[in-house]
Amino acid sequence: LLEDGKKQEQLCVKKYQGYANSVQDVQLKNLLMEIAQEEQHHHDMIDQMLQGMTPNMTHSGGATIPQSNNMFESFSGNTNDQILLEDLLSTEKYVSSFYDTVVFESADPKVRQAIQHIQKDEQNHGQKIFNYMNSHGMYDVKY
């Protein structure tokens, strides 16, 4: 399962980097590059575990991206940005779910702790994407 996770993280890095180069909004571009760096860190952590090492769970400290305070800001980007974000949100949902299985099938407590750390980050990535989409009119929240 760790090999699968490593492949997933590499795919996420490529997606985030590629999409960052395709989006119109500078704030979004910065957000996607920040997440790409975190995905690379996850890839490196899994690689360390596959080599029998204890993974370094400390992030290198990517830049914090300020979020818009106006929750009713109208979406002025293009439809392509929304499609890319929908794909990324779906990816984060899938990857987080994938790590559910890995956590339950991890016999080594250190591996389990590292995977839980990665899973929490993936959920945070999804939350950041959701918040961006919601604040830019791309995600209609139903209560």
Task: Show which residues each predicted segment covers.
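Acidic/histidine-rich alpha-helical segments that form the ligand environment
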Residues: 1-21, 67-117
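Conserved alpha-helical segments that form or flank metal/cofactor-binding pockets of metalloenzymes
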Residues: 26-63, 123-137
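A generic hydrophobic-segment detector
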Residues: 97-143
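DHp/HisKA dimerization-phosphoacceptor four-helix bundle of two-component histidine kinases
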Residues: 7, 34-41, 87-90, 117-124
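Carboxylate-rich helix-loop segments that flank metal/cofactor sites and access channels
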Residues: 47-86, 90, 138-143
